[in-house]
Amino acid sequence: FPYATEEVSFTNGDYTLSGTLTLPEGYSRKTPVLLMVTGSGQQNRDEELFDHKPFAVIADALARAGIATLRYDDRGLGDSSAKPMEWTTEDFKSDALAGLELLRRRFDKVGVLGHSEGGTIAMMIAAENKADFIVSLAGMAISGAETLLWQNRVALKGLGFTDEQVAPYCKMLETAFDVRVNGGRMPNPDDYNV
């Protein structure tokens, strides 16, 4: 390969996150570097799914183009420490900020490339002016509730459900999201003819 890789780790509070730094030939402090943040659900540094490793492929292409990357295992996965629990997007953003700190010690121009939830995290970091640039791959530009409703609606329609069948289910989901944010009693599916 026309680049080097280096196994690294960084900490965020009680968590140690492990990853792979991919360094193009002739890299220096002036080489741009991207922190790669995975999408929702626990994922390894390569965002591996069905033996496909999209983050490894992207890191390879970027290194060949002269851009360094750091991709890392999510909390509690691969070589990263943690016991599984309920983590939020804010928690994963905090992990990404810790990764950016590691990169800033070695590089002058540091950005974030995020996929799905990682794209949203990239935008959150950019809004705080903590990255020099970002790349969002399918990051949400609408609320999480709106995204989940849309995803469920599309999935159910794709499975052949009619609008009349999908509507009460999505109404129940809307109520559940509202209860999760504002408190109250979770909806009973029987009340929605689901």
Regions found by a protein language model. Give the residues of each.
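Alpha/beta-hydrolase active-site loop
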Residues: 86-105
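Alpha/beta-hydrolase
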Residues: 37, 72-74, 137
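Primarily recognizes the serine-hydrolase "nucleophile elbow" in alpha/beta-hydrolase
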Residues: 99-161
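Accessory cap/linker subdomain of secreted extracellular hydrolases
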Residues: 137-194
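Conserved alpha/beta-hydrolase
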Residues: 57-79
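Short beta-strand element of the alpha/beta-hydrolase
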Residues: 30-40
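N-terminal cap/lid segment of alpha/beta-hydrolase-fold proteins
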Residues: 1-29
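The serine-hydrolase catalytic nucleophile loop
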Residues: 44-57, 74
